[in-house]
Amino acid sequence: MITAIFINVGRGPIVDEKGLAKALKKEKIGAAGLDVLEVEPMDPENPLCKLSESDRLLITPHIAWAAVEARTRLLQEVYKNLKAFQKGEKRNVCTG
């Protein structure tokens, strides 16, 4: 059995959910943990629903951000961004 664990807490649409369901059924990967789905709330026709009794699939309701550490970091970054804004400084600049 393959023991790789697939985890997605970023964006739902980047995962081929049909392919993931197939890989889990055929034991091509050991397990999967998802905090995001392509369609939320989860569509009853989603192929992952058929694996709901699997002990190799964990789906959480888009709450990865809710960990104390994540919220603490969020507040720290907001504070730093506000301070930088007051000083006319730029932070977290993304250019394409």
Predicted regions located by residue number:
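Helix-to-beta-strand junctions that scaffold the AdoMet/dcAdoMet cofactor pocket
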Residues: M1
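Rossmann-like dinucleotide-binding domain for NAD(H)/NADP(H)
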Residues: I5, V9-G96
